[in-house]
A protein has these predicted regions:
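A short SAM/SAH-binding and catalytic strip from SAM-dependent methyltransferases
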Residues: 156-171
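Conserved beta-strand signature within the Rossmann-like core of class I S-adenosyl-L-methionine
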Residues: 157-159, 184-194
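S-adenosyl-L-methionine
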Residues: 102-152
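Class I S-adenosyl-L-methionine
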Residues: 196-229
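A short glycine-rich, Lys/Arg-flanked "PGG" loop and its adjoining helix->strand segment in the class I
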Residues: 170-186
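Rossmann-like AdoMet
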Residues: 1-59, 77-110
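Conserved beta-strand/loop positions that form the S-adenosyl-L-methionine
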Residues: 62-64
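Glycine-rich SAM-binding Motif I of class I
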Residues: 69-73
Length: 229
């Protein structure tokens, strides 16, 4: 195997992540990929927005970094279980190979979710750049494109799951954050695993309001910002 090829690693909660030798970076926290996604994006992103906006749907989500597909799959499950329609727009300039995504073990992490296992591969196998419903409550558009080039739609929740500022600094600077902020609906939130001071400063400069929220296991902090209603 080429030493520069992505490879699967196991994180502390037993779930897989993908390590990229080229960047010396993994797609998820080494402390637990599965629980990080649930904590940052489902609990403090989707659930928090929904608690403030019950009855308002469809929920429009924009994700920076489809990656392993874990956030999308967990959101699909949430939409089905809550019977709330979700429009999910995600970008990924460098999709994983079939060899990698078929070996990921996320569908084995919770035996109560086995009904949804088939959707994980369907998320990866579906065509790029074409939006379509995957279930009665989950419509997704995956685009093989960069944040710089994507055309954004109005959004209620932003899952900002890019590689770290040390690896992709341009994604965390004000010009691209402002592009996202402009697309956010009043009352929308922005969540990410990153808690860097310069990120928070940039978000505040865009007139977003920051929360003090705890990080996922293994991390003291994360970042959540709200757009004023």
């Amino acid at each position: 195997m080429n030493k520069q090829e992505p490879r699967i690693i196991t994180t502390e909660d037993g779930s897989h992540s993908v390590y990229l030798p080229e960047l010396n970076e993994s797609y998820h926290s080494s402390h637990g990929a599965y629980r990080e996604s649930i904590h940052v994006f489902l609990l403090y992103g989707l659930e928090a927005w929904y608690a403030r906006n019950r009855g308002k749907f469809p929920i429009r989500i924009f994700e920076v970094g489809f990656g392993t597909g874990l956030n999308a799959w967990l959101t699909l499950i949430w939409a089905e279980q809550n019977q709330v329609p979700v429009l999910y727009h995600t970008i990924e300039p460098h999709p994983l190979s079939e060899k990698i995504y078929e070996a990921l073990n996320f569908t084995q992490m919770d035996e109560t979710l086995t009904h949804y296992n088939g959707y994980f591969k369907r998320l990866h196998k579906m065509d790029w750049d074409i939006g379509k419903p995957l279930t009665d409550y989950f419509n997704i558009k995956k685009e093989k494109i960069t944040l710089q080039d994507v055309q954004l739609y109005p959004t209620d929740i932003v899952y900002f799951d890019a590689f770290s500022p040390k690896k992709q600094p341009e994604l965390w600077e004000k010009p691209l954050l402002e592009k996202i902020e402009t697309s956010m609906n009043p009352g929308a939130n922005f969540v990410t695993y990153c808690a860097a001071g310069h990120l928070k400063k940039n978000l505040l400069s865009l007139d977003l309001t920051l929360d003090d929220v705890p990080g996922p296991p293994g991390k003291k902090e994360m970042t959540r910002a709200w757009k004023k209603s």
